[in-house]
Regions:
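Residue-level detection of the helix-turn-helix DNA-binding "recognition helix"
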Residues: 12, 26, 37, 65
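Residues within the helices of the helix-turn-helix
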Residues: 8, 19, 33, 47, ...
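Short, basic-rich loop-to-helix N-cap that marks the start of a DNA-contacting helix
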Residues: 38-51
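A short, Lys/Arg-rich alpha-helix, primarily the initiator
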Residues: 1-17
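The alpha-helix within a helix-turn-helix
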Residues: 11, 22, 50
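Short, charged recognition helix plus adjacent turn
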Residues: 9, 61-71
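Short alpha-helical DNA-recognition segment
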Residues: 15-33
Length: 71
């Protein structure tokens, strides 16, 4: 699973709010909602975030293996 917990930390460090992403960079509330819920986000959106925040993908996203269950 890809999680975006680091995104919110990086945004805070860079002084970028969700409101600013919506107002100045035309992010939709749906895009932000998917990020909050660790949902599907396309690579274009991730690229935009890296450009806006001047950061690497590892500063906004992290891969965490799904827990395997025995069937």
């Amino acid at each position: 699973m890809i999680v975006y917990d680091k995104l919110w930390v990086t945004m805070k460090e860079k002084g970028i709010t969700q409101y600013k992403l919506m107002k100045d960079y035309h992010f939709s509330s749906g895009q932000l909602d998917r990020l909050r819920k660790n949902g599907n986000v396309n690579t274009y959106t991730l690229n935009q975030l890296c450009e806006i925040l001047n950061c690497d993908i590892s500063d906004i996203a992290e891969y965490i293996p799904d827990k395997k269950t025995d069937a």
